[in-house]
A protein has these predicted regions:
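Short, charge-rich amphipathic segments
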Residues: 31-34, 54-64, 135-137, 160
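N-terminal secretory signal peptides
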Residues: 1-27, 41
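Surface-exposed flexible segments
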Residues: 43-44, 96, 223-225
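N-terminal twin-arginine translocation
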Residues: 22-48
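Small/flexible residues
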Residues: 17, 23, 27, 31-32, ...
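Solvent-exposed helix/loop surface patches that form functional interfaces
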Residues: 48, 106, 110-224
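N-terminal mature ectodomain segment of secretory-pathway/periplasmic proteins
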Residues: 49-51, 55-129, 205
C-alpha cells in the first residue's frame, strides 16, 4: 500500500466494503437490534433500518461501516458507506472510502453503483438488470450475468447461494460457503476461495459482525457501533 513516510502494514480488508477478491458461486449489538425495522421485499423477515459497525484492527478503531435501508413498496434500496483512515505518527498513511448502492425489487437486483477511493485512486462500477440477465460494468470489464446474480454484500446472507460478483470491480466470484449454527439460533457464514472472511447473524438474520484478513495478514473486525 503506497503511503507517505513510513509504510505501515496494510490496514484495509483484502476486499472493500466488505466484498471478496476476484474469482460463480458455491455453495453495540443492542443498538443494531433496537433500530426501526423494515420488511424485506420478497419475504416477511424484518431488518433494522440501519446497521452501523466500527472497523477494528489490532485493537484500534480505524473506521466505520454503515448500511442504510429505504423501502418504497416492493423496492428496497441499501446504501453502504465505508470510511477507513490509518495514521502513523500523526500522518495519514492510508485512506479508504467506498460508497455502494443497490436497489432490489422483490428478490431480484434492479441496479447497483459503486465508487471506491483508495488513497486517491478511484474505481467505479455500474450494474443493471435487463430481461433475463444482470449487466455489470466495472474496472475488471463487462460481464453478462444470470438474472439472479447479486453483488457480494454481507448484510443479507440469503444471497450467498446466488451467482455473486465483486461489489467494486464487478468480477464474478467463485467462493465456497459453509454455515455453522451459533448458540441462541444465530449463524456464522464462512467464505473461502479467494479470501478468508466470515459473517455472524442473529436468529432473525440480522447481520451482527464480520471478520477478515487484511492484506498484511492482520485481522480486521466489524463490531456493532
Amino acid at each position: 500500500m503506497p503511503a507517505p513516510g513510513p509504510t505501515p502494514p496494510a490496514a484495509a480488508p483484502s476486499r472493500a466494503g466488505p466484498g471478496a477478491r476476484s474469482g460463480g458461486r458455491q455453495v453495540g449489538r443492542r443498538a443494531v437490534l433496537s433500530a426501526p425495522l423494515l420488511l424485506i421485499p420478497g419475504g416477511t423477515r424484518a431488518r433494522p433500518a440501519e446497521l452501523r459497525f466500527r472497523v477494528v484492527r489490532n485493537g484500534s478503531v480505524i473506521g466505520t461501516h454503515r448500511v442504510a435501508f429505504a423501502e418504497a413498496g416492493e423496492v428496497l434500496t441499501a446504501r453502504t458507506e465505508v470510511d477507513i483512515t490509518v495514521k502513523v505518527l500523526g500522518i495519514t498513511a492510508f485512506r479508504y472510502a467506498h460508497r455502494f448502492e443497490e436497489v432490489w425489487a422483490r428478490d431480484r437486483l434492479r441496479s447497483a453503483t459503486s465508487r471506491r477511493d483508495r488513497n486517491g485512486t478511484v474505481t467505479e462500477l455500474r450494474a443493471r438488470a435487463q430481461e433475463g440477465a444482470v449487466l455489470v460494468e466495472g474496472s475488471a470489464g463487462r460481464f453478462h450475468l444470470p438474472a439472479e446474480a447479486a453483488p457480494l454484500s454481507w448484510w443479507d446472507s440469503r444471497r450467498f447461494t446466488r451467482p455473486l460478483f465483486d461489489n467494486d470491480t464487478g468480477t464474478p466470484l467463485q467462493l465456497r460457503w459453509t454455515r455453522r449454527a451459533l448458540p441462541g439460533g444465530g449463524s456464522l457464514w464462512q467464505a473461502s476461495g479467494g479470501e478468508e472472511s466470515e459473517g455472524t447473524y442473529a436468529a432473525d438474520g440480522t447481520w451482527t459482525g464480520w471478520k477478515t484478513r487484511a492484506e498484511d495478514g492482520s485481522t480486521v473486525l466489524y463490531e456493532p457501533a
